[in-house]
Amino acid sequence: MALAEADDGAVVFGEEQEALVLKSWAVMKKDAANLGLRFFLKVFEIAPSAEQMFSFLRDSDVPLEKNPKLKTHAMSVFVMTCEAAAQLRKAGKVTVRETTLKRLGATHLRYGVADGHFEVTGFALLETIKEALPADMWSLEMKKAWAEAYSQLVAAIKREMKPDA
């Protein structure tokens, strides 16, 4: 399954990718809070220094898996990411509100988020999804669909990561 390209060279999120994302999101949605936390714990397992990027974790003695602020943040990020992926084909672009994208861009810029951070997060997202789905549902095509959706969300955030003029 190849990703299609538009006339301007942009990657088009196709019907097959959309179907895979929608089908898998339907399975995961009911457990979004738990999966969001697992997603962030995986990020911190891969890149422990990432914890320091979150002010609410810096001086906390609460174990990560019990931290209420992390739980709330993790679920919010996971749901927004998955919902943006689920809407990608219908909208033809990332559907996160422009004000939200601007805020995300500014926040990621302020905390020094770099390409490597997005890569770790993307890897953790794919691993979380893989573990959340029944084994017979996960496939190379599923992985590619989610990777493309994540890639387009990251591109939208990066476009907003610019210092104030």
From Swiss-Prot:
Sections of the chain in a coiled coil: none
UniProt cross-references to InterPro entries, sorted A to Z: Globin, Globin-like_sf, Globin/Proto, Leghaemoglobin-like, Leghaemoglobin_Fe_BS
Any GO MF annotation of the entry: oxidoreductase activity
Binding positions for heme b per the UniProt entry: S55, K69, H73, R103, T107, H108
Domain Globin: 12-162
Site (Homodimerization): K143
Pfam families, A to Z: Globin
Catalytic activity: Fe(III)-heme b-[protein] + nitric oxide + H2O = Fe(II)-heme b-[protein] + nitrite + 2 H(+)
A cellular component term, taken from the record's GO annotations: cytoplasm
Motif (Homodimerization): 45-49, 115-127
Keyword Nuclease listed: no
Keyword Oxidoreductase applies: yes
EC identifiers of the protein: 1.7.2.-
First-level EC class: oxidoreductase
Compartment(s) where it occurs, according to its Swiss-Prot or TrEMBL record: Cytoplasm; Nucleus
Family: Belongs to the plant globin family.
Subunit note: Homodimer.
Function: Phytoglobin that reduces nitrite to nitric oxide (NO) under anoxic conditions (e.g. during flooding or in waterlogged soil). May not function as an oxygen storage or transport protein. Has an unusually high affinity for O(2) through an hexacoordinate heme iron because of a very low dissociation constant.
Identification of the protein by name: Anaerobic nitrite reductase GLB1
